[in-house]
Structures are given as C-alpha cells and as structure tokens.
Amino acid sequence: MGAVAIVLEAFFIKEDPDAGKKDRAVRLRDSIHSITPDLRNLLISDVLIRFAEQIPTAFVVIWAVDRNGITPLQFGILATIGIVTGMLVQIPVAILADRSTKKPFVLTTFVFFAAFPIVLYFSRSFSALCGAFVLRGLQEYGEPTRKALILDLAPENAKASAFGTYYLLRDIIASIAAFGAAWLWNRGPGVNFFTAAAFGAAGTIYFAVFGRDLKSAS
C-alpha cells in the first residue's frame, strides 16, 4: 500500500512551478513564533486530548483480551467497528462544519476522547465493548474539521510551517504520556483509564472556554 501511495503521489500531485522561487530558509524558532494565540489555545487543548488518547491506547487490547476474556477474533471485530464508525462520520461531519462553525464539531470530538476511557472501564462484555469501540470510532468525528481549523488559525503567509510546527510540538509533548502510561496501568486499569479521562476533560474544558470559533466562508 505504501508503494501504491508513492506512485499515486508521483503521478497525480502536481508541483508548483514557482516553488523554487519561494524557497527560503525556515527556522524552527520562526515557525514557533508563527503559532498565533488562537492556534496556541487549540494546541494546548489538543495536547491534553492526546494525553487522554495515548495513556490507555497500549492497554486497550490487554483490557479486552486478558482482563475480560475477549478472543483475538472478537477484538479484530471490535477494531473493525471502530474503523468503520470513523470512516462513516468523517465526511458528513466535515460537510456540516463547512456550512457552519467549526468549534462545536471539534469540541464534540474532544468529548468523545474524554469519554472513551470511562466507557471502556465499565465495558466488561463483548456487546458492551462494541459500544465502547463505536465511541472510539467517533473520535474521528471532527478530525478533518480540527485540521481545517488549524489552517484557518495559522498566519496567511506561513500556513504550512505553522501546521508542521503545531504537530511537532503536539507530538513531542504528548509522547510524555507513553512514559507514564505503564506506571499508571501497574497501579490499576482504573487509575490508567480515569487519569486519561481527566486529561480529556481538561482539554475539552480548556477548548470550550478559550477555543476560537470561526464561521465558514460559505
């Protein structure tokens, strides 16, 4: 699939003929300064949400298979439920967001991230876990909208560098969660899951209070 993606990119993505004329040295410091206050608020909330995502993510399969007797085949079904749910909601939600404001859709996505660890903790059967994985799929609900909002909030003359710097900073900081996740799990699944939910709630509240809403041009 990776090879197919490379071939498609080579044939169908056209290079800007003026790209060479626009090239200039890009400094990380300048890119960081391109993060506007509104974009910084989105970044802070997004980092907290990624903590909520990363803390339990390595232990979801352990929780389902080892702790609750789910078979590997059943877990494969659960994973498929999550993936299909995400696929089904992304495009309709993105269309709705283009016709209105983006903040409600991003905020709803953050709520799903915060709720998933709690729902997962109380899901002890295959049927209950099916519901939990529907919720996991709904975490993709507003992802295209959030990415569009990043570009909307980035400076007009530095959108690409601001976008890349946003993800660099987010992923570096969010990777810290991986170091503490195992320690939290060893304290107990509930400690791990509810700590993740607390970070998710903090990110959701922060964005609800400080996140900027934008009306679509259409």
What are these regions (language model features)?
Residues 1, 62, 66, 175-192:
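Transmembrane alpha-helix termini and helix-breaking/packing motifs in multi-pass membrane transporters
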Residues 1-19, 203-211:
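C-terminal membrane-cytosol helix-exit motif in multi-pass small-molecule transporters
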Residues 15-48:
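Juxtamembrane intracellular "pre-TM" segments in multi-pass secondary transporters
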Residues 58-75:
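Short amphipathic helix-loop junctions that connect adjacent transmembrane helices
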Residues 88-101, 185:
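Helix-to-loop junctions at the C-terminal end of transmembrane segments
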Residues 104-119:
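Structural signature of the two symmetry-related core transmembrane helices
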Residues 121-132:
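Helix-loop junctions at membrane interfaces in 12-TM secondary transporters
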Residues 141-154:
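Intracellular juxtamembrane helix-capping segments at the cytosolic ends
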